[in-house]
Curated annotation (Swiss-Prot):
The keyword Transferase applies. It comes from the Bacteria. GO terms for molecular function: methionyl-tRNA formyltransferase activity. Belongs to the Fmt family. It holds the Pfam family Formyl_trans_N. InterPro entries: Fmt, Formyl_trans_C, Formyl_transf_N, Formyl_transf_N_sf, Formyl_transferase-like_C_sf, GART_AS, Met-tRNA-FMT_C, Met-tRNA-FMT_N. This is Methionyl-tRNA formyltransferase. The lineage of its organism: Bacteria, Pseudomonadati, Campylobacterota, Epsilonproteobacteria, Campylobacterales. Its EC number is 2.1.2.9. Keywords: Protein biosynthesis, Transferase. It catalyses: L-methionyl-tRNA(fMet) + (6R)-10-formyltetrahydrofolate = N-formyl-L-methionyl-tRNA(fMet) + (6S)-5,6,7,8-tetrahydrofolate + H(+). The gene is fmt.
Length: 305
């Protein structure tokens, strides 16, 4: 039975953690995750998704939430646990060489590396209109997502939002980690092709700001930034549900309401047309498109804003 230290934080990581802890070939000896965070208006201290799952279902397994992995005591703790593998998935901390040298460190990255190294591989793939994505296992080294590839699985992501793709890739990753660890000695690591490498940065709230220039680009932003940070106009109006109707139409005025439907409306961009199904003004409740227009006394050929 191989001893595993798992390092991960969000629900994507929990799916992988669950697969490992339930498999009879592995013994989870510790979880490392981010410290509890103050969440919401009341700033309630909340554990990470992985910590909540493990403490509720496997309370005897130790959980560590260090602020730094460079602490000599933390490195000693990991060494004393004597893991066969350290598995990392969306942990949010960089592993120092002192830890990388203790055992094979296998990272599960939510892209087909070397494409989309960094913090937002799923959102970046959607923004770039990729129809395929995937997950890969990688031998970690000191660079950011630069290690040799062990195995990978790919899937179709066309017209899926980030939340849906996260779930899809988490389930793939849960299968992939079992395959990689069980066949580790038979796998020949494959060096990444540096000339094909791309980087992606962390998503910020302001990335959700949109204009009505291009319907296709707005639609891709909507998919990429669901559930967070969402998409919103400069006046704070959020588009919560929308569909791409036409990406080429150009003979209407930007922002013009083209047609009212039962629970939605068609909106003209400078290029293309969107169906707005649900939207929300800042500080107010969400409304379906038709109800929102009725409340504002807006009709066909009026400007939305």
């Amino acid at each position: 039975m191989k001893k595993i230290i798992f390092m991960g934080t969000p629900s994507y990581a929990t799916c992988i953690l669950k697969a490992l802890v339930e498999n009879e070939n592995f013994k989870l000896v510790a979880l490392f995750t981010q410290p509890d965070k103050a969440v919401g208006r009341k700033q309630i201290l909340t554990p990470s998704d992985t910590k909540a799952f493990l403490s509720q279902n496997y309370p005897s397994i130790p959980i560590f939430t260090p602020s730094s992995l460079k602490d000599k005591n933390i490195i000693r703790e990991i060494k004393d646990l004597n893991p066969d593998f350290i598995v990392v998935a969306a942990y949010g901390k960089i592993l120092p060489k002192a830890i990388l040298d203790l055992a094979p460190c296998v990272n599960l990255h939510a892209s087909l590396l070397p494409k989309y190294r960094g913090a937002s591989p799923i959102q970046s793939a959607i923004l770039n209109k990729d129809e395929k994505s995937g997950v890969c296992t990688m031998l970690m080294e000191e660079g950011l997502d630069t290690g040799a590839i062990l195995e990978s699985l790919e899937c179709d992501i066309k017209d899926k939002n980030s939340s849906e793709v996260f779930e899809l890739l988490a389930n793939l990753a849960a299968k992939l980690i079992l395959s990689t660890l069980l066949n580790f000695d038979k796998i020949t690591p494959k060096k990444q092709e540096e000339s094909l490498a791309t980087l992606c940065r962390k998503i910020k709230k302001e990335d959700g700001l949109i204009n009505l220039q291009n319907a296709r680009e707005l639609y891709q932003k909507y998919l990429a930034f669901t559930p967070w940070p969402g998409v919103f106009l400069e006046n704070g109006l959020k588009f919560l549900e929308l569909e791409l109707v036409d990406e080429l139409k150009q003979n209407a005025k930007m922002g013009e309401i083209l047609e009212l439907e039962k629970e939605s409306f068609l909106l003209a961009c400078k290029q293309g047309v969107l169906r707005i199904k649900k939207l929300q003004e800042s500080g107010k409740k969400a409304l379906d498109g038709r109800t929102y227009l009725n409340g504002k006394r807006l009709k066909s050929e009026d400007s939305l804003c």
